[in-house]
Amino acid sequence: MRTKSFRPLAALVAAVVSLFGGAAQAQEEEKVLNIYNWSDYIGEDVIARFEKETGIKVRYDLFDNNEIVHAKLVAGKTGYDIVVPSSNWAKLQIDGGLLQKLDKSKLPNLRNVDPAIQAQLAKMDPGNQFLVNWMWGFTTVGINVDKVRAALGGPLPDNVWDLVFKPEFISKLRSCGVSFLDSSSEIVPAVLHYLGRPAYSKNPGDYAAAASTLKSIRPFVTLFSSSGYINDMANGSICLAVGWSGDINIARQRAIDGKTGQNIQALIPKNGGLLFFDTMVIPADAQRPGNAHKFINFLLRPEIAAANTNKVFYPNPVPESRKHIRPDVANNPTVFLAPAELARMVAPDSLNNDMRRLMTRTFTSFKTGL
């Protein structure tokens, strides 16, 4: 009887030992971290510093649009431990159960993040449970100043979006090269905003208006690119790009460093560009979430955040990093926007899958010329 009475207790003890033993094993992750991030979006020695400090080997793959990232996450088994989607796409991924919640006890440097950035992310991620900002910026127009002025034969329009969405302007620029981002979620909201419609409209009729405008300018777009346009601007192969603010500044810096003679400038639209907040997330099936938390926490150190901004000309979410940022970057008005200009920017919004599909069809028709 006594032996029999102890069997349940023995089983319970074995279960507890197994549970805690399994937890200990889970914490002993392989010294590897797989990251999937945007191209041209990290400081030169940031990965090397993390690897040296932690002994974790980073495998770092690149993408150039949110559509690719989302498709991979939906398919599952990406093999990645950190992915960097924009916040409005991450909202879809949260809703779809594709991400795992952050363990904030492993992220003490979250205290360094600007509350205003956290508030922006909370619009997509209530309670800031899944997303941490990597960096942010805005979608705008970048130009080769000398070539554009020569092609126009006069001054720039007051509304810089006229350069790309009015045939009378863009038709004059075709000869020196016009590039658009190869992404429905960038170009369609931009033209909707230009037309005075909600950039992330839920009204199908607005997309018909966008399609009409895009069709009128299609003959004058010579390139669709979400990464290669940086070098194309720097070497003078194109004179205008609808692109991201930091990328256009990278092109400017490469032109300076390479002494190519190209005068590249990111423009700040008076009626606003499209803000984006790129976020670090951990896929639901990530194999090394502990290593992922270590990297996220590392990125939120002021000196590390500054190293990223100094290299790629995008603002980071850590205010204390400003003292580590080079003066030429800190004083660049297209990197750190003036409050009035920031107020005119359009904040990101989420769309359901039906509206996403309509946006994709609108862009595909534009790109193919159909």
Model-derived features: positions:
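Conserved C-terminal helix/tail region of periplasmic/extracytoplasmic solute-binding proteins
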Residues: 231, 339-370
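A bilobed periplasmic-binding-protein/Venus flytrap-type ligand-binding module shared by bacterial periplasmic
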Residues: 142-147, 193-196, 276-288, 307
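Short beta-strand->loop
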Residues: 100-111, 131, 162, 258-274, ...
